């Protein structure tokens, strides 16, 4: 049962980890290109801060159309997690990367296409031996049809499992203890919180030219660094770096016009019945 829940959690994380961080950017699909790199030696003056606040507000307005209804949006994303954390008194080493595409339509249906490579290791306190988990795969999810697909290679405790599986999306998320309703995502509230951070006297803001910002702030007692990059057509890309429970986390979100496509030959994906050879 523990293994089933672990696999469900890994797959669900691939599908929805970034669904609560929706922002708008545009036309910078090459995630290997570090568009945020710059010489952030200049402290932002009052005019630059006002422009930054205006740009942040645009993130909220881009999420709706002229009639105030949800707009169709698309995002390229890259997430990295690396470091050591404590779990039940044991040190767990984690190194993971997730990349992909996340889109929403006017009806707030969410589609995702993600690839992930995740490895974790910990020492078994009973045997004092190192135990490792390795996961590699691709996943697709469609809230409108309530379907999810995964092409996975999973290894744990010396046992391997690989294959193509089809899931009931709600059941998958339920097994992982995750419940996400895109309609509950309050873009305006998130942007207002961000603007409050910008107004904090302890927040440091640096600029490089008129289209790059670096923000150093404390959020809930944790130091975070955010980068904003404004494209030529005025849209915003966003990167967040921080540390949580000993893990270095980076989230990079950029706009795209691409659409999520179903995997080829979906008939090759067998329904997952929860039975694993572990």
Q: Where are each of the predicted segments found?
A:
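N-terminal secretory signal peptides that target proteins for export/translocation
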Residues: 1-3
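C-terminal motif of bacterial Sec signal peptides marking the signal peptidase cleavage site
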Residues: 21-24
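Subset-of-secretome marker
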Residues: 26-278
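Sec-dependent N-terminal signal peptides
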Residues: 5-17
């Amino acid at each position: 049962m523990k293994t089933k829940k672990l696999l469900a959690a890994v797959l669900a994380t691939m599908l929805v980890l970034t669904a609560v961080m929706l922002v708008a950017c545009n036309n910078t699909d090459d995630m290997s290109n570090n568009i945020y790199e710059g010489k952030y030696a200049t402290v932002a003056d009052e005019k630059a801060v006002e422009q930054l606040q205006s740009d942040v507000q645009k993130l909220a307005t881009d999420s709706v159309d002229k009639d105030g209804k949800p707009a169709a949006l698309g995002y390229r994303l890259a997430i990295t997690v690396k470091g050591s954390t404590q779990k039940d008194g044991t040190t767990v080493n984690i190194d993971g990367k997730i990349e992909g595409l996340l889109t929403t339509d006017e009806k707030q249906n969410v589609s995702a296409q993600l690839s992930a490579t995740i490895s974790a290791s910990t020492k078994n306190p009973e045997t004092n031996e190192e135990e490792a988990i390795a996961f590699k795969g691709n996943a697709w999810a469609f809230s409108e049809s309530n379907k999810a697909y995964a092409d996975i290679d999973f290894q744990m405790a010396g046992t391997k499992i690989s294959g193509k599986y089809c899931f009931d999306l709600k059941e998958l998320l339920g097994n992982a203890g995750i419940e996400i309703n895109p309609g509950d995502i309050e873009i305006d509230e998130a942007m207002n919180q961000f603007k409050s951070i910008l107004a904090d006297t302890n927040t440091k803001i640096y600029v490089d030219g008129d289209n790059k910002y670096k923000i150093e702030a404390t959020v809930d007692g944790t130091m975070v660094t955010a980068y904003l990059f404004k494209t030529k057509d005025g849209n915003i890309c966003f990167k967040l770096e921080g540390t949580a429970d000993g893990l270095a986390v980076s989230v990079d979100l950029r706009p795209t016009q691409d659409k999520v496509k179903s995997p080829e030959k979906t008939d090759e994906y067998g329904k997952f019945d929860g039975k694993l050879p572990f």
